[in-house]
Regions:
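Alpha/beta-hydrolase fold nucleophile elbow
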Residues: 1-7
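Alpha/beta-hydrolase-fold enzymes
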Residues: 12-97
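Active-site nucleophile elbow and catalytic-triad environment of alpha/beta-hydrolase enzymes
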Residues: 108-126
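Short beta-strand/loop motif that positions the catalytic acidic residue
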Residues: 130, 136-138
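Conserved alpha/beta-hydrolase "acid-adjacent" motif
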Residues: 143-149
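Catalytic histidine neighborhood in serine/cysteine hydrolases
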Residues: 155-171
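Catalytic histidine-centered segment of alpha/beta-hydrolase-like enzymes
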Residues: 167-182
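C-terminal alpha-helix
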Residues: 184-196
Length: 198
């Protein structure tokens, strides 16, 4: 079995692969692997005022959760300086470009309390525990999931491989880059998973 994850899901795949030696291969692309680095990048993009407002909402939401009340949500993406999870200049346009034309029944928002846990989320610390082949696909101009921690994951994982692309976080989800990334990931799976099974 192979695991695949992108962005925040990439961090979950890394942690799962580190905890389960039965995984045959894993691929993480533009992965969120270091909460401290991602939080610093997010604060630079959002600015002080929006970061403060996001923190206040997160604390209020955490208190509401303790009392069993409905969550306070924040948008997943927004323009720089707004209260949202991703506010880089490319975030809103990049995110909207990958959505289906009419995503029925889904609101791109999360419970604000997640902000309180992001800095301590560091799946990169488990890279040396990943025993399966691991492909780390990194976007060199990623302002959401900083590339340097992901590059270190590829270096520290015993069977890590690194693919780098001169693009931003959302650029690998469409067009030429999608085709290139998919070709690299399929080749990785053929080498490390399918060839082993045959």
């Amino acid at each position: 079995m192979a695991l695949w994850g992108t962005s925040f899901g990439g961090g979950h795949v890394l942690a799962t692969a580190a905890a389960n030696p039965r995984i045959g291969a894993a691929i993480i692309q533009n992965p969120f692997v270091d909460g401290r680095a991602a939080a610093a990048a997010a604060m630079r993009s959002a600015g002080r005022v929006a970061t403060y407002r996001l923190a206040v909402r997160a604390l209020r939401d955490a208190l509401r959760a303790r009392r069993g009340r409905d969550p306070i949500y924040v948008d997943l993406v927004g323009e720089p300086g707004t209260v949202a999870m991703m506010t880089t200049p490319d975030a809103r346009a990049g995110f909207e470009a990958i959505l289906p034309p009419d995503p029925i029944g889904w609101e791109p928002a999360v419970a604000a309390r997640i902000v309180l846990h992001l800095r301590s989320d560091r799946p990169a610390a488990k890279a040396d525990q990943v025993t399966c082949p691991l492909l780390v696909s990194v976007c060199d101009h990623d302002a959401i999931a900083p590339p340097d921690p992901a590059i270190r994951v590829a270096e520290e994982a015993p069977r890590g491989e690194l693919s780098r692309y001169p693009i931003g976080h959302f650029d690998l989800f469409a067009g030429e880059w999608l085709n290139r990334v998919c070709a690299d990931q399929i080749a990785f799976l053929r080498r490390n998973l399918i060839a082993v099974v045959q």
